Amino acid sequence: MNKIFSLVVLCLMTGTLMAQQPTANQAPHASVTPLTSKDLPDFPGKEVLMITVEYPPGSSDPIHRHNAHAFVYVLEGSIIMQVKGGTEVTLTPGQTFYEGPGDVHVVGRNASSTKPAKFVVFLLKDKGAPVVTPVPE
């Protein structure tokens, strides 16, 4: 029974990993790691979520929104960010970027095709709301 269970788990994991692999025409996907979340008693219905995002070389995000206040702090590498109606900016370690709840994030990518980039994001959002909402192009 344990062998069958192990085989099923292995097959599921392999399928999941294969589904996440970019094709030859796609940029590699970003890796998002939740660090912590905290309810804010002084702000009923709100929570703070802190995540790290790692962009492999050449990685980029699809157009999206957060429906949250998002505060970005670059840890390593260089990233390019832009919200709809805003100016495209290149950020390096120690620099910050802000997205408001109504902003549509039209550019988010690693500035390098050879080096990874990593940043931390603090999101002030409605409790239980999704972190990212896709926006049709």
Predicted regions and their residues:
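A short, N-terminal "cap"/entry segment at the start of jelly-roll beta-barrel domains
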Residues: N2-S6, C11, G15-L49, Q82, ...
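Extracellular/periplasmic catalytic domains that process cell-envelope and extracellular macromolecules
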Residues: D42-G45, R65, Y73, T90, ...
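Short, surface-exposed binding/anchoring microloops in extracellular/periplasmic proteins
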Residues: P44-E47, T52-P57, D61-R65, F71
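Extracytoplasmic
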Residues: G45-M50, H69, G86, G102, ...
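Glycine- and acidic-residue-biased ligand/ion/polar-headgroup-sensing regions
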Residues: H66-G85, P93-Q95
